[in-house]
Amino acid sequence: CIRDSFLYGRLNYYAATDSAYQDKQPTYLAEADTIFAQVAVKVPDNYLGNFWRARVNSLRDPETTQGLAKPYYEAALSILEQKPDATKSVLVECNSYLGYYYFVKEDYNQSKQYWNKILEIDPENETATKALGGIK
């Protein structure tokens, strides 16, 4: 069942974030990524598989230097943008990652686009405001 798979994937993700299991983090992340990939394939019109893959790969690349989470945040965002009732916090997380990714890559124009999207969703968002203030 997809729901059970999804919950098992989240269990692995949260185990990977627990400091008591840091030695097993790569194993938990690999398992979670595999499960969320299956969820994304089985339910392609739902953002959750890609969104959680993004979170997993963000843990694998904490400095965002490799952009491992980028394709999954983009995929989740493309699904979410088709849904008028999309959860704002999820939209903000996707756009924040992508804004930061492009900032790290020194593509400031692209970075600004994502930070501005956040301000359209949440005009009081301090992170987006600070990020835009830091881009020349």
PLM regions: where:
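Residue-level recognition of tetratricopeptide repeat
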Residues: 46, 91, 124-125
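Conserved small/polar residues in nucleotide/adenosyl-binding loops
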Residues: 1-5
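Canonical positions in the second alpha-helix
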Residues: 38-39, 76, 118
